[in-house]
């Protein structure tokens, strides 16, 4: 399929060919939802740690003898039913990862790229770089590109471009192989350079 490719610095545009099998597929909401949930679950870290009765300090001695006191039998002051005792079913070391097959991941990438293009949130651009790594140049370039809240997906990330844009909080820069469906949906717009569009077409087409 033919789309317009923008040269941000000059404002000129030209037609290029992109893979119809990637950027022209129908929307599959169920697949995209499943893969995005799996990708975000994989980013979770199980930091919460709770102690069971064995991990709580103390409680090695039997509080009172088994029989003859009239009280309920007890073997440890760290029993889960005691105040200050351990948890019966402590949390910690959870594994939140979900399995995503390669074909599912590829299908979700095709779906999100095609839908962003249909919505006008994906723009193909020519690969550019700055003469020097300056945030001032980055700000001017962003204003020509349509403002921030944007993800730049590049075939190869130019160093000066990366250094000139990294200070802006709502601007993401990534290589084409480092982005997933959740990353593409995180920003208002996606700028995809020509090389990245070609590589995505080869891999997911």
UniProtKB/Swiss-Prot annotation:
Specify whether S-adenosyl-L-methionine is a keyword of the entry. no
- Disulfide links within the chain: none
The entry lists its GO molecular-function terms as: rRNA binding; structural constituent of ribosome
- What's one GO BP annotation on this UniProt entry? translation
What keywords would UniProt list here? Ribonucleoprotein, Ribosomal protein, RNA-binding, rRNA-binding
Q: Does the keyword Manganese apply?
A: no
- For region Disordered, the annotated ranges are 53-77
Give the matching InterPro entries. Answer: Ribosomal_uL4, Ribosomal_uL4-like, Ribosomal_uL4_dom_sf
Q: Which domain of life is it from?
A: Bacteria
Mark out the compositionally biased spans (Basic residues): 59-70
One GO CC annotation, please? ribosome
What is known about its subunit structure?
Answer: Part of the 50S ribosomal subunit.
Family, according to the entry, reads as follows: Belongs to the universal ribosomal protein uL4 family.
Function field: One of the primary rRNA binding proteins, this protein initially binds near the 5'-end of the 23S rRNA. It is important during the early stages of 50S assembly. It makes multiple contacts with different domains of the 23S rRNA in the assembled 50S subunit and ribosome. Forms part of the polypeptide exit tunnel.
Q: Which HAMAP family match?
A: Ribosomal_uL4_B
Name of the protein in its database record: Large ribosomal subunit protein uL4
